């Protein structure tokens, strides 16, 4: 029998669908159409994003999440799969968790990255297109992590995982380590995978009831014997003008050295380049529908392909 205070386990299914139209203002829109070097929302004309279906089971002590994606955005997000399973390229997240105590949770399986301000699901981002910092950071991990509530708004996460974005199994025998220290919604993140490492700060501040400022900054170094690296920072000011409409800007500066991650695509004689991208997005909400008109301008230091 259940006590009156006990809650029955809950199984829920949720999800989103996104579609879009994209056109270049000063570049071809035919078979020679180009797009920014960031991830997702790169296809011309009327295009598909993805369908996202999430099944979750929440018990008092344990639960699971099965997060499936279908469509071009989902395919791009799980670019390293299928590695073994024929259906591996639809699994965005697949993990189980155990609430060891009120302050400790263990999670094992495939989960989206803890680094960065933006996420794979467009419904959870203010801007529809994505930043360079998000695009060239990790997307997902498979491993085990421990989350600790340290009290007084402090939190700590530690993780041991397969190499970055190898989500179905580990073909290399190498392992990555991750750390996150959080305080009152501000997070300092660290990831080391196969000699490469990334340090990331993600946070935000409510400057008033209607004005929010998000912040993301990161530095990535490829490996001990490779000088390639990138760094960048982005600001996300957002203002709510009414209950149904908000306006947001993403201003990002991104720089690569020794070829970096290949994001910009054109470099000087030393292999260096930088890009400044400004994205203005409106967000209009009608019930469960979000409509996001967006204008994006990317300007690179070299003669790279950009819009």
Pin down the residues of each PLM region.
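Surface-exposed coil loops of outer-membrane beta-barrel proteins
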Residues: 20-45, 74-93, 101-182, 187-192, ...
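Residues on the lipid-exposed face of transmembrane beta-strands in outer-membrane beta-barrel proteins
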Residues: 15, 19, 44, 48, ...
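Outer-membrane beta-barrel pore domains
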Residues: 37-40, 74-77, 82-87, 184-190, ...
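Acidic/polar N-terminal loop/beta-strand segments that form early-domain functional surfaces
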Residues: 16-22, 51, 56-60, 65-71, ...
């Amino acid at each position: 029998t259940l006590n009156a205070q006990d809650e029955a386990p809950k199984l829920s299914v949720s999800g989103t669908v996104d579609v879009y139209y994209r056109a270049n203002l000063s570049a071809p829109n035919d078979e020679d159409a180009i797009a920014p070097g960031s991830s997702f929302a790169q296809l011309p004309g009327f295009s598909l994003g993805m369908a996202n279906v999430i099944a979750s089971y929440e018990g008092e002590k344990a639960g699971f999440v099965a997060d499936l994606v279908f469509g071009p955005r989902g395919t791009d997000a799980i670019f390293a799969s299928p590695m073994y399973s024929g259906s591996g390229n639809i699994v965005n997240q697949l993990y189980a968790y155990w609430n060891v105590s009120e302050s400790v949770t263990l999670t094992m399986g495939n989960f989206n990255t803890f680094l960065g301000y933006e996420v794979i699901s467009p419904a959870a981002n203010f801007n529809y297109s994505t930043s360079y910092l998000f695009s060239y950071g990790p997307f997902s991990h498979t491993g085990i992590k421990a989350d600790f509530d340290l009290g007084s708004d402090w939190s700590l996460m530690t993780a041991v995982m397969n190499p970055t974005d190898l989500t179905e199994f580990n073909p290399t025998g190498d392992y990555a380590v991750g750390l996150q220290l959080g305080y009152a919604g501000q997070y300092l993140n660290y990831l080391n995978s196969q000699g490469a490492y990334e340090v990331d700060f993600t946070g935000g501040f409510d400057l008033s009831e209607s004005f929010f400022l998000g912040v993301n900054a990161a530095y990535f170094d490829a490996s001990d014997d490779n000088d390639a690296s990138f760094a960048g920072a982005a600001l996300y000011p957002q203002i709510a003008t009414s209950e149904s409409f908000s306006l947001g800007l993403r201003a990002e500066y991104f720089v690569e050295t020794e070829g970096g991650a290949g994001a910009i695509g054109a470099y000087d004689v030393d292999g260096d380049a930088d890009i400044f991208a400004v994205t203005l997005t409106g967000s209009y909400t009608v019930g469960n529908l979000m409509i996001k008109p967006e204008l994006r301008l990317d300007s690179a230091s070299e003669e790279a392909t950009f819009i």
